[in-house]
Structure formats: structure tokens, C-alpha cells
Design a protein with these regions (language model features):
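Non-globular, low-confidence helical/coil segments that flank catalytic cores
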Residues: 1-212
Length: 212
């Protein structure tokens, strides 16, 4: 893998990455990871997950990169624009300080929003960095406090994926959020129902549910 992007350090966003890094560290897999990319936060002293994840990556021989709004990473013809966090982010509000990425290739634009809420969506709107996209990774598992109507009027995704567990106790995804997505004209896939979603070259979409 060229890189694994971690939007923020809540346990439900890093547990799988941690396990994978442990396998690499112990040489239990042939998989190799070049980079671990994290949001650049000014205050990580009290963020145990952040510190331990970076230490594990370094022990596994994986380069750790931190990014902020305005940074850009390229893989051939693919560009990854970092829209958030802002340069002054402390990381104390892990959801609102989460990494937001726009992926741009020849025929595809995708937006990955971590667990940000409408507060950060409004800041992104004010910054003028949002645009119409083909794909949206819906923020915060479809929480009612994310993916607002004004935000959707700008990004207008053709496909929106909501990542959530069938057994989550938070009521995700919110019916309000699903209605806003449908009103914006988006096709909606919920991993709770369809399993993992894979997009190839921005053209083909497939879902795979290994649980029968």
C-alpha cells in the first residue's frame, strides 16, 4: 500500500489499522505499507491513541506523515488535496479536527469527510474549497449532525456511502441525513446493509458482504 489515511484517532477508526501495523511489525504478512498519514495536530500529548499509533508505525518501518489544509499528495495522475484540519487545529476536538480529503483523478472526484459535523462543514463552505463531487464518504456514520443541506447543495455527490455497524447504539444513520442525501439526488449505500464498498478507477462500484 502506498499509504493509509487515518482521519482521526477514535477507536472505531484506528483499530483495524493498528492490527494491520502489528502484523507488519511482526512480519506476519507479506503486505507492505509505505506511509501512515495522520492529521497534523498541535496537541497530541494527551491523545494516547495518536501517540501509540505513530510509535507502532515507526516500529513497523512505516513512514509517518502529518498533513493540514492546503497540503497535497500525488500518486501518478491522482491528487489528494487536504481540505482540513486547519493549521491551528489542536486535535482536542477529534471529530471536528478530523482529516478531510478530496481525491481527484481524470474522471473522478471523491470527498472523504471523517467524522466532521456541520460546524466544520460550514467552515469548509466559507473557505470556498468545496466543489461538486462524484463520491462522498458520508461524515460521522450518517449522524444527524453532519452532512447538512447547505453542504450537499455544493458537493452534490452522485454516490454517497454511509459506513456504520448494524449493531451500533447511536441510531446511525439518521433518517434526517438519509433524506437530505436523497433530496440532493444521491444514490446511497449503507455498509450495514451492503457490506464493504469498493470503487475502482472512479468508474465501477462493487459491494461485498462476507457475513452470510
Amino acid at each position: 500500500l502506498d499509504g493509509i489515511y487515518v482521519s482521526h484517532t477514535d477507536e472505531d477508526h484506528i483499530s483495524g489499522v493498528r492490527e494491520l501495523l502489528e502484523f507488519v511489525e511482526k512480519d506476519l504478512t507479506s503486505l507492505r505499507i509505505e506511509n501512515l498519514i495522520l492529521p497534523k495536530w498541535s496537541d497530541i500529548q494527551e491523545n494516547k491513541n495518536y501517540r501509540e499509533l505513530t510509535e507502532l508505525a515507526e516500529s513497523a518501518g512505516v513512514r509517518v506523515l502529518t498533513v493540514k489544509a492546503g497540503d497535497e499528495i500525488r500518486y501518478g495522475t491522482v491528487r489528494l488535496k487536504v481540505l482540513w484540519p486547519e493549521s491551528t487545529a489542536s486535535g482536542k476536538e477529534v471529530n471536528e479536527d478530523a482529516m478531510v480529503l478530496e481525491m481527484i483523478s481524470k474522471d473522478f472526484k471523491g470527498l472523504f469527510t471523517g467524522d466532521i459535523g456541520m460546524v466544520t462543514e460550514e467552515k469548509l463552505i466559507q473557505n470556498g474549497c468545496l466543489e461538486d463531487v462524484d463520491f462522498l464518504k458520508t461524515a460521522h456514520h450518517g449522524s444527524r449532525y453532519s452532512t447538512g443541506a447547505e453542504f450537499l447543495e455544493i458537493v452534490r455527490p452522485e454516490l454517497a456511502v454511509v459506513s456504520c455497524s448494524a449493531t451500533n447504539t447511536y441510531g446511525h444513520p439518521s433518517q434526517d441525513t438519509l433524506e437530505r442525501l436523497k433530496k440532493s439526488g444521491s444514490r446511497v449505500l449503507i455498509t450495514r446493509d451492503c457490506g464493504a464498498v469498493t470503487i475502482v478507477n472512479g468508474k465501477s462500484v462493487s459491494a461485498f458482504n462476507r457475513i452470510k
